[in-house]
């Protein structure tokens, strides 16, 4: 068995992994994407896919879509942490079914 060089625990040792799609509505302003991505990278969560688009110019809102993989506990933690970020208005989490 090869030991991982990662500072973070490897998900395969933690439990069953599921792929989730997060849709996050945020203020369309400088630095918001960095805060959202920083939440993932700072805790060692991998972003498999990322897309950002302005959705409402009048209300100055953008939608960030992130695909990630994690255990149910990790996904719940990500959801709670995203909801605490100041520029975040709404978080939707969808489990991807194969």
Put a short name on every predicted segment.
Residues 1-98:
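A conserved regulatory-domain signal marking ACT and ACT-like small-molecule sensing domains
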